[in-house]
A protein has these predicted regions:
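Glycine-rich phosphate-binding loops of nucleotide-dependent enzymes
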Residues: 1-232
Length: 232
């Protein structure tokens, strides 16, 4: 991503953001509310079409593509607030995640695979998504996104409104299972401490600009980051 700009009406909210996510990495965007983190993800996934700049996936531009074509190229977003289909069962939600695929046998195998990552989903397979707890819905949202076999998975605030124990479980899955499977992750997360600890690299956004970047370890030790986002 290079020189990414986005405006709503006359108000520009991203002022030339540059960031890179290399294959196999976990990269985080941290920053205060309103810094432009979620907007960055929605511009990259082409949900917001007003953005200008360079956006490439595997060296190919995705600017101008419809969101569903971006999914076919291998980029998927887990939205803030989960946004599962409340009136569909867990299994039906997972099947919806594979809407770009035609290989039924492979889809069935992947349902079994993601349920292995989050065993509670197997137990709840016939239950309506809207009846799940917040943590279970977040697991379902991540599993649904994985059903498209993404190369780049973007997650927006996965810890929001979830009990700390479940947050830890979700982060362990992202760190261990997805890394083992070679899925690249771009994470937006208010829990800066947890995000930086699991990230290879991270960017700090402030009012629509990249203010700092470095490895997760470097930013955990940075006095400016510690004072602004880690409570030290």
């Amino acid at each position: 991503v290079a020189n990414l700009k986005c405006a709503f009406g006359r108000a520009e909210v991203l002022h030339g953001v540059h960031l890179e996510v290399r294959a196999g990495e976990i990269v985080s965007l941290i920053g205060a509310n309103g810094a432009g983190k979620s907007t960055t993800l929605m511009c990259v996934s082409r949900i917001h079409r007003q953005a200008t700049g360079t956006i490439e996936l595997d060296g190919r531009s995705i600017v101008g593509l419809a969101p569903q074509e971006v999914v076919r190229r291998g980029l998927v977003q887990v939205p803030e607030g989960r946004r599962i289909f409340p009136r569909l069962t867990v299994r039906e939600n997972l099947e919806m995640g594979a809407f770009t695929r035609t290989d039924r046998a492979g889809v069935a195998e992947d349902i079994d695979r993601v349920c292995g990552m989050f065993p509670i989903l197997r137990e709840r397979a016939g239950q309506l998504g809207g009846t799940l707890s917040g943590g279970e819905q977040q697991m379902l949202a991540i599993a649904r996104a994985l059903m498209s076999r993404p190369r780049l998975l973007m997650m927006d605030e996965p810890s929001m409104g979830i009990a700390p124990m479940l947050v830890a479980q979700i982060f362990r899955t992202v760190r261990d299972v997805l890394r083992a499977q070679g899925v690249t992750v771009l994470l937006v997360e208010q829990n800066a401490n947890a995000a930086l600890r699991m990230s290879d690299r991270a960017y700090v956004l402030e009012t629509g600009n990249v203010a700092l970047s470095g490895t997760g370890t470097e930013l955990l030790r940075d006095e400016r980051v510690r004072a602004a986002y880690l409570g030290h």
